[in-house]
């Protein structure tokens, strides 16, 4: 397991952690069962197969 050789300052630790941000998911417009819905790309196939509820 990797172990740090030197102590990191609080400022450096927080600056490093601040780079970890969640990204916005891009929505795609799909026509499913005659209605247009905006869903994430990774859920398009599941929506077409009826595995998820789109109400």
UniProtKB/Swiss-Prot annotation:
It comes from Corynebacterium urealyticum (strain ATCC 43042 / DSM 7109). This is Large ribosomal subunit protein bL32. One of its GO terms (biological process) is translation. The lineage of its organism: Bacteria, Bacillati, Actinomycetota, Actinomycetes, Mycobacteriales. Keywords: Ribonucleoprotein, Ribosomal protein. GO terms for molecular function: structural constituent of ribosome. The keyword Ion transport does not apply. It comes from the Bacteria. InterPro entries: Ribosomal_bL32, Ribosomal_zn-bd. Coiled coil: none annotated. The keyword DNA repair does not apply. It holds the Pfam family Ribosomal_L32p. Belongs to the bacterial ribosomal protein bL32 family. The gene is rpmF. NCBIfam families: rpmF_bact (TIGR01031). Residues 1-22 are annotated as: Disordered. GO terms for cellular component: large ribosomal subunit. Residues 1-19 have a biased composition (Basic residues).
């Amino acid at each position: 397991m990797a172990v740090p050789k030197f102590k990191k300052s609080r400022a450096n630790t927080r600056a490093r952690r601040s780079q970890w941000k969640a990204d916005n998911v891009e929505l795609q417009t799909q026509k499913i069962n005659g209605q247009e819905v905006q869903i994430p790309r990774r859920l398009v196939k599941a929506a077409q197969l009826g595995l998820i509820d789109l109400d």
